[in-house]
Amino acid sequence: MDALQLLTWSLILYLFASLASLFLLGLDRLAIKLSGITSLVGGVIGIISGITQLHAGVTLVARFAPPFEFADLTLRMDSLSAFMVLVISLLVVVCSLYSLTYMREYEGKGAAAMGFFMNIFIASMVALLVMDNAFWFIVLFEMMSLSSWFLVIARQDKTSINAGMLYFFIAHAGSVLIMIAFLLMGRESGSLDFASFRTLSLSPGLASAVFLLAFFGFGAKAGMMPLHSWLPRAHPAAPSHASALMSGVMVKIGIFGILKVAMDLLAQTGLPLWWGILVMAIGAISALLGVLYALAEQDIKRLLAWSTVENVGIILLAVGVAMVGLSLHDPLLTVVGLLGALFHLLNHALFKGLLFLGAGAIISRLHTHDMEKMGALAKRMPWTAAACLIGCLAISAIPPLNGFISEWYTWQSLFSLSRVEAVALQLAGPIAMVMLAVTGGLAVMCFVKMYGITFCGAPRSTHAEEAQEVPNTMIVAMLLLAALCVLIALSASWLAPKIMHIAHAFTNTPPATVASGIALVPGTFHTQVTPSLLLLLLLAMPLLPGLYWLWCRSRRAAFRRTGDAWACGYGWENAMAPSGNGVMQPLRVVFSALFRLRQQLDPTLRLNKGLAHVTARAQSTEPFWDERVIRPIVSATQRLAKEIQHLQSGDFRLYCLYVVAALVVLLIAIAV
């Protein structure tokens, strides 16, 4: 049985799980178990399919009798799609295991319907990766968007519905851009098959138009700036295992689409240099502003969603380098850029999935998203705390975890730009490196804040004081992802050549030197990555701080004493503990132009019960783009909708007239 046949069985299981959930409406507990177990098995088969295809190393193509003449049903599984299937299936397995007990919280609240939409969501993502026809690609892309939209609005409260509407608008705006790009290529090729697109040699102007349409269309799904506004609202609104899939793998469909169009469908046309520079620029801006806005958040899931914008930016940085390499016919830049992009795509799926599952575990016990109402959870939820600690270290690119490895390769790709003689790239490379360095520092600060405020210190609410560990299936799911974060880092010298082979096969570039003890990336001294030295670095860096800590502890043990914290003469209260607002305050001053601070008087906040005064604190920090651009657009759209609402008269005859008028306009347009 080949990889495509295995993948077909995986899709059948997802569809069976979705239909079974639909027929079990009202029997939520049974639907949760059936949906979770079936999708788990489907994910395992998907993993086997991806590994089988990567091991075989050949492109598989299957054609079926089309239901429409213009839309051939063709499946094509190459190295990139197999890699994406593997990444998605890994996270599906873990999230399915997690859902078996997590979804009990939604019993009686539409859990069976959520199982239906969840499995449709997974199936559409996986099928989209191997679809080789523009019509069916768009159909599956829309299925993915609509099913995830239903998951976003699952709670049916005002916040989730507002988030869902913004997501719906931006997702479909992106779909329209992608559709126009495919129609332009279809007009030139006379077919909607991707195979015909690959043979096109478009004019520079038309090729650039197609690329920009596809880039911003798929970029809206990826959550890159400036099309990111839906992401920090929609992802936190969904159930946590759905958030893990949306943030961990759904946004990567956007990255996949950008790679597919720019480096596959338009490869015959050729890539202008400015395409890669544009992708690098937007990636750098997304990375820096994404982590900066994450730092300002008090909502734990919104913080993680903003961090996804940051990591999408890092991936786009590496993708931009790869596109520059293709433009300059430089296989080193191309392969190293894709190595960094694909490695970080995999790693981000794992540690972001882990952190969203950890956030879901916390929220299920404390019933709040506000980190200021958490604290001291490491004592009460030790397994969750341990798993989240690994996730925070990984996402902060701290060795010896996987986030460090992929960001290291991204750095290598940027260093490799120094070999290029183009002045624009000699300027773009250092600027991107500075922005990536600042991003890395802010990311460490962000997740120190998240972990410290959430798991350390004193409990800041009754729910935090009474919190208990989550059930074993949720713990096992989180620990599996934590173990993968460590395992992938330690196997980097084995895994990197495999990913480089995927990059080579996808772009048809000459393979770089890959061997044990030999530089993974051939080039000058400062661009070389040696597996043995990298492994030594991974083992040594975490060991040195540990030795220093033991030395300091032995020296100070004799002089240490324990007592109450000094509170300036007042009795200690948990509200006096350091807060996320305090951590962020210096950055609010430095980057004040990028934030709009909202304050609200709260009479319930009193540091001392004997003081009946009103204290003020920042309730939210609104990003500049959302406040100055997105909010006015939304308001204008709402006003326009009210103005044209009279067209919805309820008169069926008038609606028929609208249809006839639209048909006449279309016929005139075609005739002209």
From Swiss-Prot:
GO terms for cellular component: formate dehydrogenase complex; membrane; plasma membrane. Disruption phenotype: Deletion of most of the operon (hyfBCDEFGHIJR) has no visible effect under fermentative growth conditions at pH 6.5 or 7.5, during aerobic or anaerobic glucose-limited growth at pH 6.5, or when combined with hyc mutations. It is found in: Cell inner membrane. The keyword Cell inner membrane applies. InterPro entries: ComplexI-like_HydComp (IPR052175), NADH_UbQ_OxRdtase (IPR003918), ND/Mrp_TM (IPR001750). Residues 1-5, 52-79, 141-164, 221-242, 294-311, 364-384, 449-474, 526-531 are periplasmic. GO terms for biological process: anaerobic electron transport chain; anaerobic respiration; ATP synthesis coupled electron transport; formate oxidation; glucose catabolic process. Pfam families: Proton_antipo_M. It is an enzyme of class 1 (oxidoreductase). The chain crosses the membrane at residues 6-26, 31-51, 80-100, 120-140, 165-185, 200-220, 243-263, 273-293, 312-332, 343-363, 385-405, 428-448, 475-495, 505-525, 532-552, 652-672. GO terms for molecular function: NADH dehydrogenase (ubiquinone) activity. Induction: Most efficiently induced by formate during post-exponential growth at low external pH (pH 6.5) in the absence of respiratory electron acceptors O(2+), NO(3-) or trimethylamine-N-oxide, i.e. under anaerobic control. Transcription is activated by FhlA and HyfR, inhibited by HycA, part of the sigma-54 (rpoN) regulon. Second member of a 10 gene operon (hyfABCDEFGHIJ); it is not clear if the 2 following genes (hydR-focB) are also in the operon. Keywords: Cell inner membrane, Cell membrane, Membrane, Oxidoreductase, Transmembrane, Transmembrane helix. The keyword Transmembrane helix applies. Residues 27-30, 101-119, 186-199, 264-272, 333-342, 406-427, 496-504, 553-651 are cytoplasmic. Its EC number is 1.-.-.-. It is a multi-pass membrane protein. PANTHER family: FORMATE HYDROGENLYASE SUBUNIT 3-RELATED, HYDROGENASE-4 COMPONENT F. Possible component of hydrogenase 4. Belongs to the complex I subunit 5 family. This is Hydrogenase-4 component B. The gene is hyfB.
